[in-house]
Amino acid sequence: MQASADSTRMECLWSNWKCQAIDLLYWRDIKQTGIVFGSVLLMLFSLIQFSVVSVMAYLALAALSATISFRIYKSVLQAVQKTDEGHPFKSYLDMEISLSQEQIQKYTDCLQVYTNSIAKELRRLFLVQDLVDSLKFAVLMWLLTYVGALFNGLTLLIMAVVSMFSLPVVYDKYQAQIDQYLGLVRTNMNTIMTKIQAKIPGTKQKE
């Protein structure tokens, strides 16, 4: 019964985090999104200048400086006012953050499903189960060689973060026009791939 309650609570938390992520990406709260966006970019730009270990150490020191200073401030304030409010972070210290065995098993099963799905798809592409799909994958890998030559992984990550916080807003504002152009591109690509597939011996057109 307890495991079921924990699972329900975890699902509610996951749903809540999902809604919060959507609100962040769509800039529903400009101040909150700005803080998160700026913090992530600052951390990524810091990684350009410093190693991961240094950045993590600096972040830990900054967090400790804030919490220790606040703890000392509250202790002095309680001593001056002669009050006993207890530990300032007591509510966070008492918060349950452990995962039950059922929750761990659930997330492990989800990870296993995704891993198996990716492995099967890669096997299908590399062993040329469908020639056209394998050719598409080869073209994608060929394009990525040029992308990798122009940008390093960290630069691509920064571009991905900027896109995550900008593209949803742009799409939400110009959804009709973007859907129209994407439909045209998809139609043209399907037409081209159908012509190519028709000229390749031994391939069958997908229904």
Swiss-Prot record:
It is found in: Endoplasmic reticulum membrane; Nucleus. One of its GO terms (biological process) is brain development. It holds the Pfam family Reticulon. Its main location: endoplasmic reticulum. It comes from the Eukaryota. Residues 21-207 form the Reticulon domain. PROSITE patterns: RETICULON. It is a multi-pass membrane protein. Keywords: Endoplasmic reticulum, Membrane, Nucleus, Transmembrane, Transmembrane helix. The chain crosses the membrane at residues 35-55, 139-159. InterPro entries: Reticulon (IPR003388), RTN1-4 (IPR046964). The keyword Signal does not apply. Expressed in the animal hemisphere (presumptive neural ectoderm) of blastula and gastrula stage embryos, and along the anterior neural border, in the panplacodal primordium, and in the dorsolateral side of archenteron roof of late neurula embryos. At the tailbud stage, expression localizes to the central nervous system, including the spinal cord, prosencephalon, mesencephalon and rhombencephalon, as well as the lateral line placode, otic vesicle and pronephros. The keyword Transmembrane helix applies. One of its GO terms (cellular component) is neuron projection. Inhibits amyloid precursor protein processing, probably by blocking BACE1 activity. This sequence corresponds to isoform C of rtn1-B. This is Reticulon-1-A.
